[in-house]
From Swiss-Prot, chain A:
Organism expressing this protein natively: Drosophila grimshawi
Protein name: Ribosome biogenesis protein WDR12 homolog
UniProt GO MF annotations: ribonucleoprotein complex binding
Signal peptide: none
InterPro entries, per the entry: G-protein_beta_WD-40_rep (IPR020472), NLE (IPR012972), WD40/YVTN_repeat-like_dom_sf (IPR015943), WD40_repeat_CS (IPR019775), WD40_repeat_dom_sf (IPR036322), WD40_rpt (IPR001680), WDR12/Ytm1 (IPR028599)
Lineage: Eukaryota, Metazoa, Ecdysozoa, Arthropoda, Hexapoda
Curated annotation (Swiss-Prot), chain B:
Basic residues composition-biased segments: 1-11
SUPFAM superfamilies (UniProt xref): WD40 repeat-like
InterPro entries reported in the protein's UniProt record: BOP1/Erb1, BOP1_N_dom, WD40/YVTN_repeat-like_dom_sf, WD40_repeat_CS, WD40_repeat_dom_sf, WD40_rpt
Official protein name in the record: Ribosome biogenesis protein BOP1 homolog
Upper lineage: Eukaryota, Metazoa, Ecdysozoa, Arthropoda, Hexapoda
Length: 419, 786
């Protein structure tokens, strides 16, 4: 037993970037067999000298979360026990709380939150708008086939505009008057030959991009008045819109589209590739080959990394800046079935959420590949889409006809304040 | 006499020891002659002698040549002497005296020369004394270095020519007056022997009598000279015969390690020595050849051989190495089989439980004819005492059997081939290197309420269609597992097949006796509409169909209520349809009705709404049919065999022999050269159509009947589904190189289907693009493995 633990004592330096939790930078000798709990007690004891209340911390050892015993962690990383080890501690991200369950008539395949509204797309061909308090505002029929993706174009006090795509091969541009609670279909975007599976609105909200099963990536104008003259008059009246740009390059269905910046698009496809498109060049800037079909890909503006969900149980982290191609930065194991959807936090640099066919959502820290931070349970069926656009709420829709809302309890606002 | 001596000069000793000796002898002979002359009887017939001499000379005339060959120096001299002889012969008749004088002259001159070599006289003695020659020692004459070596040498015969009978015991001639014969075959008369008185008188009168001896060979008397006597005396006193000999002469080392400036002999080298010898060259070349051919060995080799022979010698301890039998018996004896130890039953007084009861006895008797089946080979018996045990009744028979065993027992141990089992397994690549292939179950499509018979994937890979025994056809979205549409039919759905042409949106559904062409209304709306238009109305056909086809098949548009479900065309068959399969272009489709006898396989043409019955005769119970992906070929599987027909030429191309009892399914490689066949007797057969009509490989991977088998369109993969609930995914690489055989590696066994009523997996089908496989099972589910 002694030999097993027998690494004896390890010298550690405790550091933090959160100033108000700082402890004096002196080396502490601690047992090698300690885990997070013991470290927490120890650190809290140190802090209590300063009269602070008890806080839960997570410990980062060499840029990776400490999950088991310290000695195991060090052994795995092949770090000598003789060295003084720097342990960075951060306040533990508080567990998101299930807040609401929004019941639908059919599978919910698309969710998007913005402000206090939640937009959902449903397999019964309707779009629904909910408040984040769980109040159903509106059901919008219009599509003739299941909705596959929705996205907000703009939202203000008076009007909300959003776009929805569906298996009926169209994308629809909607304008919603909040006060009168009336919704208008501004235009129908026709051009795709198969189901439109993904949509993304450009940062300036002037354009949006759709990816479809017909392998095409199409760009559309998001203006209320389509700036096409003359011949499009008739089309405008009928509300039919044609793509501004069509980008061909994928060999299979495009399952994920995201704007990286005003002129750069990220797409993920079933043909096992991630592509970064430059809209000025109208071509491919970077291509990352993977070995699985990609179901979802998400790019973080904070750390400029891409996390993908593909046809297996793992989430993978890619760096689009590397030239070597498919360098997987990290693999996140935890789900038990296909991961269908993934999204970075818009405020926390290291956090992202994922939804999987094993009926679970998981909240991950990208520095903790072995285990997620939290499992967000609640769904009784496959999770089809997840959204964390609103930092306060994690919203996911699933095949159990519900949308689950989890309140991300950590007041990101607080966090901002501390910064 | 003079002539005789002259002739004698020519004669040389054939066995002359050396030059010097011969020279001295010759010179001595001359002296002897004088001596002999003196004792000679005056009355002797000289002519006779002459003749003998001549004869003798002619006999040895060859030696003359020899002599001259030996020493070139003699040549001139000999000629001179011969000239002398000639001269002598001429004068023969004229004047004997002259000759004598001549002789004397030469003799004196010889004597002069002899003076220098006094030892020569001693040598003469040996000749003259004949028998006593054993004491004669040839003394090398001391040469005067100032004189040329062979200056004075001339040879003459030293043989006693008066003896013609040779060296024989002379007493043989005691009774005769003569000794031998001369040239003219006349007797040579012995010299007269005086009586004792004469001897006595001579002893008194002759002062030299004491030194007169008789030559035993010739019987003549010889007068010994003073030198002879001195020599005899010296020999008798065991001194060195030559008085001149100085025993203590200073030693001159003639042959030393020192190289002298001047040659030892001052005779110039002969011309011959400067010329390369031809014969020597021949000899050398012969030796070189012999060396090359290995007939001859160099001295080094010979030396080495000798050295080796001298080294330690090894020899066989036993006779040979190959005579293994002898050694084997020592090292590796075949041990006799061990007999069981005797048990209680074998005792003469066994405990009662070992004795047979009635049941055991009955069993014993039952195996009367097959005694080897009995548990015991004897019947336990009980005796009161050992005395009562009878003699062993089967003794003789047992001996006989033992002998028989010995006769048949193996004499040598059978050598087992010691091959490592690993070695026999073909080297297959590791499955890890053959990725991607499905490894885990990813999705389960639930919704059917009875066993799902068939599944087919949309060519683009977004949807699947499944047909079930619950009389429904369901269309599913692959990625989410959502059932998009359920189409109810009137009968059990045996087979569904999505049209492989991506430009058409049709599903062929075999339900009962009807084949439904359904528009699934998924995917591209434009295609859906186009397909609807295409199927809306029947093209006018002017071909009159034969009665045979009419009774078998009827085409009709669907009823309005079925139209709503998506059914567009109904092809009603006369028997239940079991299988439907499309041609790659999507215009033709073939159906199988196992009960249709000679009309069990049908080919329908969609665009013309026509049906054909390709076969007029039934070749067996048709199980399934298949279109070749590239060529106009048609595969028909009956229970046991597969026939390949050319649809254009309408003839049988090939018949594949499966050697199995019941074929369940077929799948053809997208390139069209390899065919996979699944059978109900647990086998999967891989046919290389270019190779032979027999299976290239037979795989027995499943534990139960194999229901279905399928090739992937893009990846080198195939999968099989079986009643043992397993889907086995294998790697099946077909190489473009015709010389390389297909590589088959079983990769993964996927066993998640539940067993229901002895059925497991009923159908397998690959996703057209992804390495994903769909399997349908008796547990009412469709499962996706990725």
């Amino acid at each position: 037993m002694e030999a097993e633990n027998g690494e004896g004592q390890v010298q550690v330096h405790l550091k933090t970037k959160q100033e108000h939790y700082a402890v004096p930078d002196v080396p502490y000798a601690i047992e090698g067999s300690v885990s997070t709990t013991e470290l927490n007690i120890f650190l809290n004891a140190l802090l209590q000298n300063k009269g602070a209340a008890s806080v839960d911390f997570d410990f980062l050892v060499f840029d990776e979360y400490l999950r088991g015993r310290l000695c195991d962690h060090l052994r795995e990383k092949a770090i000598s026990f003789e060295d003084a080890i720097e342990i960075e501690y951060v306040e533990r991200f508080p567990a998101p709380e299930p807040q609401d369950c929004l019941l639908h008539d059919d599978w919910v395949s698309a969710v998007k939150a913005s402000g206090k509204w939640i937009l959902t797309g449903c397999y019964d061909n309707t779009i629904n708008i909910w408040t984040n308090k769980g109040k159903h505002i509106l059901t919008i029929p219009g599509h003739t086939a299941p909705i596959k993706a929705v996205d907000w174009l703009s939202l203000d006090e008076v009007n909300g505009r959003f776009v929805s795509t569906s298996q009926d091969q169209t994308a629809m541009l909607w304008q919603w008057n909040i006060d009168s609670n009336a919704v208008d279909c501004v235009s129908v975007c026709k051009g795709h030959e198969r189901s439109v599976d993904s949509v993304a609105v450009s940062p300036d909200a002037q354009r949006f991009a759709t990816g479809s099963w017909d392998t095409m990536l199409k760009l559309w104008s998001a203006e209320l008045e389509d700036a096409v003259e003359g011949s499009a008059k008739r089309a405008k009246e009928s509300g039919v819109r044609t793509p501004k740009m069509t980008l061909q390059g994928h060999r299979e269905s495009i399952s994920a589209v995201q704007w990286m910046d005003g002129t750069t698009l990220l797409t993920g496809s079933w043909d096992h590739t991630l592509k970064v498109w430059d809209l000025n060049l109208e071509g491919i800037k970077t291509e990352i080959s993977t070995n699985k079909s990609i179901f979802d890909a998400n790019f973080s503006k904070l750390n400029r990394l891409i996390v993908t969900a593909s046809a297996d149980k793992n989430l993978r982290l890619y760096d689009p800046r590397t030239n070597q191609g498919s360098v997987v930065r990290n693999t996140y194991l935890g789900h038990n079935a296909w991961v269908q959807t993934v999204m970075w936090s818009t405020t926390e640099e290291f956090l992202f959420v994922s939804g999987s066919y094993d009926n679970q959502n998981k909240l991950w820290d990208c520095r903790s590949p072995k285990a997620p931070l939290y499992d967000l349970l609640g769904h009784g069926e496959k999770v089809l889409d997840i959204d964390w656009s609103n930092p306060k709420y994690i919203v996911s829709g699933g095949a159990d006809n519900t949308v689950r809302v989890f309140k991300s309890r950590k007041a990101t606002v607080d966090h901002m304040e501390t910064k | 006499m003079a002539k005789k001596s002259a002739i004698k000069r020519k004669v040389k000793a054939p066995e002359s020891i050396n030059e010097q000796a011969s020279v001295s002898e010759q010179s001595e002979n001359e002296e002897d002659e004088d001596l002999l002359q003196a004792v000679k009887d005056p009355g002797e017939d000289t002519t006779d002698d002459e003749g003998i001499d001549q004869e003798y000379q002619s006999d040895t005339s060859d030696d003359l040549l020899f002599e001259s060959d030996e020493e070139g120096n003699y040549l001139g001299r000999k000629e001179a002497s011969s000239g002398e002889d000639e001269q002598g012969e001429e004068d023969d008749n004229d004047d004997e005296e002259e000759e004598d004088e001549d002789e004397e002259e030469s003799g004196s001159s010889d004597d002069d020369a002899k003076d220098d070599q006094p030892s020569g006289s001693k040598a003469t003695l040996s000749k003259t004394t004949g028998d006593s020659s054993n004491i004669a020692v040839a003394i090398p004459p001391r040469r005067d270095p100032s004189k040329p070596e062979y200056e004075n040498s001339d040879t003459s015969d030293e043989e006693d020519i008066r003896n013609t009978v040779g060296n024989i015991p002379m007493h043989w001639y005691d009774e005769y007056k003569h000794i031998g014969y001369d040239w003219d075959a006349k007797k040579i008369i012995k010299p007269p022997k005086g009586d004792q008185i004469d001897d006595f008188l001579r002893k008194i009168e002759d002062p030299d009598f004491w030194r007169t001896v008789k030559d035993p060979q010739t019987g003549q008397e010889v007068l010994l000279t003073d030198e002879d006597i001195a020599l005899i005396k010296r020999v008798n006193s065991a001194r060195i015969p030559n008085p001149e000999h100085n025993e203590y002469e200073p030693w001159i080392e003639w042959f030393s390690s020192q190289v002298e400036k001047m040659p030892i002999k001052n005779v110039p080298d002969h011309k011959r020595s400067f010329l390369p010898s031809v014969s020597e060259k021949k000899k050398v070349s012969r030796m070189v050849h012999a060396l090359k051919m290995g007939w001859m060995k160099t001295t080094e080799e010979v030396e080495r051989d000798k050295q080796q022979k001298r080294g330690p010698k090894f020899y066989m301890l036993w006779e040979t190495d190959t005579g293994r039998e002898h050694i084997r018996r020592i090292h590796d004896p075949v041990s006799a089989p061990k007999r069981d130890l005797p048990g209680h039953a074998e005792s003469y007084n066994p405990p009662p439980e070992y004795l047979f009861d009635a049941k055991e006895m009955k069993e014993w008797l039952k195996y009367k004819d097959e005694p080897h089946k009995r548990k015991l080979h004897f019947m336990p018996q009980k005796f009161k005492s050992l005395r009562e045990v009878p003699a062993y009744s089967r003794f003789l028979r047992e001996r006989f059997l033992r002998c028989l065993d010995l006769y048949l027992c193996p004499r040598a141990k059978r050598v087992k081939l010691n091959i490592d089992a690993e070695y026999l397994i073909p080297k297959l690549p590791s499955p890890r290197d053959l990725q991607p292939f499905p490894t885990v179950e990813s999705l389960v499509y639930r919704g059917h309420t009875d066993l799902v018979r068939s599944v087919s994937v949309e060519p683009k890979g977004e949807y699947i269609v499944s047909g079930s025994d619950d009389k429904t056809v369901k269309i599913w979205e692959i990625a989410t597992g959502r059932c998009i549409r359920t189409i109810e039919t009137n009968d059990v759905v045996r087979c569904v097949a999505w049209c492989p042409n991506a430009k058409l949106s049709i599903i062929a559904v075999a339900t009962g006796t009807r084949l439904l062409l359904i528009n699934p209304k998924v995917g591209d709306k434009l295609l859906v509409k186009k397909t609807d238009d295409l199927l809306a109305e029947a093209p006018s056909s002017d071909v009159i169909e034969s009665e045979r086809i009419k009774t078998a098949v009827q085409w009709s548009n669907a009823e309005p209520e079925e139209q709503e479900k998506g059914v567009r065309v109904v092809i009603t068959h006369f028997k239940p349809i079991r299988q439907v399969t499309w041609h790659g272009r999507g215009d033709y489709l073939a159906t199988v009705m196992p009960e249709g006898a000679n009309r069990s396989a049908l080919i329908h043409q969609l665009s013309k709404r026509r049906s054909q019955i390709p076969f007029s005769k039934s070749k067996g119970l048709i199980q399934c049919v298949l279109f070749h992906p590239v060529k106009p070929c048609f595969f028909v599987a009956t229970q046991h065999n597969i026939r390949i027909y050319d649809l254009v030429k309408q003839e049988l191309i090939k018949k594949l022999l499966t050697n199995s009892k019941w074929i369940s399914g077929m799948s053809i490689h997208p390139k069209g050269d390899n065919l996979l066949v699944s059978t109900y007797d647990k086998k999967m057969l891989w046919f290389d159509l270019d190779l032979s009509t027999k299976p290239y490989q037979t795989m027995r991977l499943h534990r139960n009947a194999v229901r279905s088998i399928a090739f992937h369109l893009r990846y080198p993969l195939f999968a099989s589904g079986s009643d043992d609930q397993a889907v086995i995914v294998s790697h099946g690489m077909v190489y473009n190189d015709l010389l390389q055989n297909p590589l088959i590696v079983p990769l993964k066994k996927l066993q998640t289907h539940e067993k229901r009523d002895e059925f497991g997996v009923l159908d397998v089908n690959w996703h057209p693009v992804q390495p994903w496989i769909f399997s349908t099972g008796a547990d009412c589910t469709i499962r996706l493995y990725t």
